[in-house]
């Protein structure tokens, strides 16, 4: 609650009112009906909480809360008949203090054993057995769950001046509270409190005088409707001597019927059923601090009218249509009853009006939409870890051009709109010619499993917003493979972009790099999928062939597969390996997009969950082989970290990932330094030469399947790679929108480069990763000077290889460097920078200069199996003159040294990198996936959840942790 309740004290009280946070309502004496005789109070309904009583004075109660303002609670209390100060007069019987209080406390949804229940308590009498405090003229009765911060207090109860007193009460507490089924944490505390005082002045806060405990588990099993005496003790340890007693009239704990409540009250948002227990009490931010709940109720009914007006406009089905099958059955039964024709009426429909028929047709349309959204399969799209695309969209103007950029808030809406426009002919003649060539290749392959989704894959590319007249498609048609249809999508999918190369490249550049490049017009006018590579995949649907391959592997709930091989088939290398494995009937799943990777891993996690439910023994780790580039492994890592964050830590041992590199792969290179058998299998020259070609070989030069299965069968040891965190602050395309943040896990290398405005060329080296992010240069590339020097002095971290080559771009307006400010903190006081830097490791260190490149690695040193808790950074700077700045390491200049110098800083626990000029946007590559329009980013050496390591399988004889 955002405001303090304005409740006043009873007659003769302090008059200060309740100072606790909450909301209350008080009725004036003129509006109250005649007082009824005392009787047990029923629990107040959650929505229309109302209490009536009669008296010359009333006051409101407040629900105290010390939690955050995001949780909602409401307390309604009416007090009457408070005894006057000084006790009752002669011959008069004091009227009982009457109050009705209601509150809703939040439920811990992370625990499956926590359920909401409604607790009702009626207090009849307060007996003070001992004098607890001098000058005690008023007390407050409060209830609180043990271990919780929420407190529900009554108004001040005025006590007579005499010491030992009996006060008649008629207090009713109705609490919706979280009940834990599997632990002893259901103790309700009934406390006797008074206002705190300082030098005879009342101050904020309450002092607890006595406490009594009620076991809610016993109340749930044995409700009490008779007289019950609860002793209150000033010392919890000494329960033999009570200082006060409270007589309880009724005591009960009842379950909450959410279905009955929701059948009477309409939902107010499309996704209200996601959290059905608490959403019924939610108000908008403007009304959360209101002291008048009736005002909130009026707004609720106004919102009901608005929903009726907008019924025809809102066609998005709520998430309950996906997750709750009983609702669909109820709708269907209700519709069948409406269509049932009685014998008296006959078969004539003349009495049915057109309006009724139109209303039934609308209901049928909504039902069909619900049935289409609901997918009962165990490995279907409902298990995907995608962002919510069914939330209420912000009103925005539709872009004039279909392929132009949208903000991330509009990407969700556009993804739904694109589904309805799959049949539109929006392709240009050049695109049609390219698509015809691709389609002819598919027909030649005679692949029946792919013919059903030809149209879907073409339109999926349109949904990425990256189709243009310069799309490089015909080059890939040279190589007809089984899954060659995915190449069309591979040239546009941003999660598979492994470099920043453009079509104007050297002939020595591998075909894979040229095919995965994007034209300049696309990079400058692309959609949000370029800025956020995983946003564009929310519109995709996994192909039918993916589910067919999964069904062949996941055959039974009683047994788990020993291994699953995931292959990235967006390029010829993956298609080549997949075809060889499929010929020998290996458990292969061909994936072409991030959403398909998520679908496969979701199905695997679901099957592991079913196995655990059916078996008492722990499952053995399932080997998941990832055949592809570093960016492909990054998509698997992101889903792994996100999915297992909501599961218990023992799930971290249920899967073991096997990395099979196709092309340059920094993580695989580190694994080869730890495991010599792994290095000889996947890092030898024969393997590299095979997959660095521009086209697949005519004959098989080496036993690819034998090497893969040798690794799959022999990887019996788990090596834990630490998972680091990258927080990216991205700029929206629209200037009036605020920036947003993305949290990306990574295990390899993060590289920083300048946003290019012109085409650039890329050198090709065997040791440099394909994903090397380049900085524009005003000089032509030099293969003999700069790159060699950048990695020679001082020796860089072996895990970073030699990917510090500076690539030139003569037309770049920024020159060959970028001004950056890098703030970093060292992890341990004992770790210092190389070359003997003596600065304090616990303080912030800053590098502020012009950089040619910045690269941060989370991988340990080559050959070191011992994991470190820090990162290593390699920077290449440009020297303005012969004088070395004080912030850099001092060294003697070489004779043939160019105007750059390399520096390695180790032991970094946290790092923040930003451009010197605010208008300069950065481009960041994280484990091979490129992210653009970055204002600044922050790196942390450890991922914040319990998923802190990525389990990788190695051969048994390797040096593992």
Swiss-Prot record:
GO terms for biological process: lymphocyte homeostasis; protein localization to Golgi apparatus; protein localization to plasma membrane. GO terms for cellular component: COPI-coated vesicle; Golgi apparatus. It is found in: Golgi apparatus, trans-Golgi network. The keyword Coiled coil applies. Residues 1-70, 76-95, 260-297, 375-426, 475-540, 758-802 are annotated as: Disordered. The modification Phosphotyrosine is found at residue 249. Residues 35-46 have a biased composition (Pro residues). Residues 260-271 have a biased composition (Basic and acidic residues). Residues 1-19 have a biased composition (Gly residues). Coat protein that is involved in the localization of trans-Golgi network (TGN) membrane proteins that contain acidic cluster sorting motifs. Controls the endosome-to-Golgi trafficking of furin and mannose-6-phosphate receptor by connecting the acidic-cluster-containing cytoplasmic domain of these molecules with the adapter-protein complex-1 (AP-1) of endosomal clathrin-coated membrane pits. Required for normal ER Ca2+ handling in lymphocytes. Together with WDR37, it plays an essential role in lymphocyte development, quiescence and survival. Belongs to the PACS family. This is Phosphofurin acidic cluster sorting protein 1. It comes from Mus musculus.
């Amino acid at each position: 609650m955002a405001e303090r309740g304005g409740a006043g004290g009873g007659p003769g009280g302090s008059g200060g009112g309740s100072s606790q946070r909450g909301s209350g309502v008080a009725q004036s004496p003129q509006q109250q009906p005649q007082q009824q005789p005392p009787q047990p109070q029923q629990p107040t309904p959650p929505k229309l909480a109302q209490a009536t009583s009669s008296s010359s004075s009333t006051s409101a109660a407040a629900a105290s809360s010390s939690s955050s303002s995001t949780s909602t609670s409401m307390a309604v209390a009416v007090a009457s008949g408070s005894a006057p100060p000084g006790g009752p007069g002669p011959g008069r019987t004091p009227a009982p203090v009457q109050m009705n209080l209601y509150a809703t406390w939040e439920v811990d949804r992370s625990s499956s054993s926590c359920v909401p229940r409604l607790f009702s308590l009626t207090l009849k009498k307060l007996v003070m057995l001992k004098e607890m405090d001098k000058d005690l003229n008023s007390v407050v009765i409060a209830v609180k769950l043990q271990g919780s911060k929420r407190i529900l207090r009554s108004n001040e109860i005025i006590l007579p001046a005499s010491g030992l007193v009996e006060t008649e009460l008629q207090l009713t507490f109705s609490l919706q509270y979280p009940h834990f089924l599997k632990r002893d944490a259901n103790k309700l505390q009934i406390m006797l409190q008074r206002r705190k005082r300082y030098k005879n002045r009342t101050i904020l806060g309450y002092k607890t005088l006595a406490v009594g405990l009620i076991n809610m588990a016993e109340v749930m099993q044995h409700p009490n409707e008779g007289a019950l005496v609860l002793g209150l003790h000033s010392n919890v340890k000494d329960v033999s001597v009570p200082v006060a007693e409270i007589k309880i009239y009724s005591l009960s704990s009842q379950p909450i019927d959410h279905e009955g409540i929701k059948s009477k009250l309409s939902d107010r948002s499309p996704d209200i059923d996601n959290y059905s227990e608490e959403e019924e009490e939610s108000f908008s931010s403007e009304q959360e601090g209101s002291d008048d709940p009736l005002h909130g109720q009026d707004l609720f009914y106004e919102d009901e009218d608005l929903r009726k007006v907008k019924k025809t406009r809102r066609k998005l089905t709520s998430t309950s249509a996906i997750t709750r099958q009983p609702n669909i059955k109820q709708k269907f039964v209700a519709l069948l009853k409406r269509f049932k024709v009685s014998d008296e009426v006959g078969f004539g429909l003349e009495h049915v009006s057109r309006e009724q028929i139109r209303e039934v047709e609308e209901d049928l349309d909504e039902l069909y939409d619900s049935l289409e959204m609901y997918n009962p399969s165990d490995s279907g799209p409902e298990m995907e870890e995608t962002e919510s695309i069914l939330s209420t969209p912000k009103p925005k103007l539709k872009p004039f051009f279909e392929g132009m950029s949208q903000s991330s808030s509009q990407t969700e809406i556009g993804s739904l709109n694109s589904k309805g426009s799959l049949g539109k002919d929006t392709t240009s003649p050049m695109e049609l010619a390219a698509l015809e060539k691709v389609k002819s290749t598919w027909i030649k392959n005679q692949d029946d499993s792919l013919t059903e989704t030809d149209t879907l894959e073409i339109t999926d590319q349109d949904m990425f917003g990256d189709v243009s007249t310069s799309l490089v498609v015909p080059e890939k048609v040279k190589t007809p493979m089984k899954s060659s249809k995915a190449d069309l999508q591979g040239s546009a999918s941003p999660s598979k972009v492994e470099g920043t190369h453009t079509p104007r490249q050297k002939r020595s550049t591998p075909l894979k790099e040229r095919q995965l490049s994007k034209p300049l017009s696309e990079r400058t006018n692309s959609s949000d999928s370029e800025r956020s590579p995983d946003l564009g995949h929310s519109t995709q649907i996994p192909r039918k062939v993916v589910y067919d391959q999964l069904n062949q592997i996941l055959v039974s709930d009683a047994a788990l597969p020993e291994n699953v091989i995931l292959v990235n088939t967006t390029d010829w290398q993956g298609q080549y390996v997949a075809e060889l494995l499929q010929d020998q009937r290996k458990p292969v799943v061909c994936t072409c997009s991030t959403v398909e990777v998520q679908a496969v891993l979701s199905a695997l996690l679901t099957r592991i969950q079913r196995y655990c439910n059916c078996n008492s023994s722990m499952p053995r780790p399932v080997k998941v082989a990832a055949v592809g580039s570093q960016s492909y492994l990054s998509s698997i890592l992101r889903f792994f970290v996100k999915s297992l964050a909501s599961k218990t830590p023992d799930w971290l041992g249920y899967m073991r990932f096997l990395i099979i590199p196709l092309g340059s792969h920094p993580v695989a290179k580190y694994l080869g330094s730890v495991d010599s058998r792994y290095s000889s299998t996947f890092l030898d020259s024969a393997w590299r030469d095979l997959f660095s070609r521009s086209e697949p070989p005519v004959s098989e030069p080496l036993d690819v399947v034998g090497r893969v299965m040798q690794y799959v069968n022999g990887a019996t040891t788990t090596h834990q790679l630490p998972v680091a965190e990258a927080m990216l602050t991205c700029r929206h395309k629209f200037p009036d929108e605020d920036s947003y943040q993305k949290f990306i896990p990574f295990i390899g290398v993060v590289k920083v480069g300048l946003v290019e405005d012109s085409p650039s060329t890329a050198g090709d080296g065997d040791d440099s990763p394909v994903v090397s992010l380049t900085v524009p240069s005003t000089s032509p590339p030099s293969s003999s000077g700069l790159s060699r020097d950048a990695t020679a002095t001082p020796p860089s971290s072996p895990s970073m290889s030699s990917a510090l080559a500076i690539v030139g771009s003569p037309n770049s307006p920024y020159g060959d460097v970028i001004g950056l400010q890098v703030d970093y903190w060292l992890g341990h006081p004992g770790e210092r920078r190389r070359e003997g830097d003596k600065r304090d490791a616990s303080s912030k260190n800053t590098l502020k200069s012009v950089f040619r490149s910045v690269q941060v690695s989370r991988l340990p040193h080559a050959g070191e199996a011992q994991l470190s808790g820090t990162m290593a950074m390699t920077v290449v700077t440009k020297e303005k003159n012969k004088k070395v700045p004080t912030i850099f390491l001092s060294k003697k200049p070489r004779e043939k040294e160019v105007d750059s110098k390399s520096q390695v800083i180790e032991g970094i626990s946290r790092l923040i990198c930003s451009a010197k000029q605010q208008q300069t946007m950065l481009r960041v590559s994280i484990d091979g996936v490129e992210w653009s329009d970055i204002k600044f980013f922050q790196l942390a050496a450890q991922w914040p959840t319990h998923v802190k390591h990525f389990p990788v399988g190695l051969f048994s004889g390797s040096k593992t942790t």
